[in-house]
């Protein structure tokens, strides 16, 4: 059963981003609350956060590797 990709409204995206800014991981309780407020399923919230964490990791990958390099070069 293949699902089409979900498109989120501007409001939903904004709220999810705001939540992510404060917390990269959600408790089940918080996920239920957000799902209710944004009229999304828990599954959609869970997957949005998983995808967002991957994007965050990718965006911050270079920063951590470059700071590691400078720390190593001092030895």
From Swiss-Prot:
Q: Which CDD domains match?
A: homeodomain (cd00086)
Give the residue range of the signal peptide: none
Q: Which domain of life is it from?
A: Eukaryota
* One Pfam family here: Homeodomain
Which cell locations does it reside in?
Answer: Nucleus
Q: Which InterPro entries match?
A: Antp_homeobox, HD, HD_metazoa, Homeobox_CS, Homeodomain-like_sf
Q: Which GO terms describe its cellular component?
A: nucleus
Query: Looking at the keywords, is Heme present?
Result: no
Alphabetical keyword list:
Developmental protein, DNA-binding, Homeobox, Nucleus, Transcription, Transcription regulation
Principal location listed in the UniProt entry: nucleus
Q: Which residues bind DNA?
A: 1-60
* GO terms classed as biological process: anterior/posterior pattern specification
The Swiss-Prot or TrEMBL record annotates one GO molecular function as: DNA-binding transcription factor activity, RNA polymerase II-specific
Q: What does this protein do?
A: Sequence-specific transcription factor which is part of a developmental regulatory system that provides cells with specific positional identities on the anterior-posterior axis.
Q: Which family does it belong to?
A: Belongs to the Antp homeobox family.
Name this protein carries in UniProt: Homeobox protein Hox-A7
> What species is this protein from?
Salmo salar
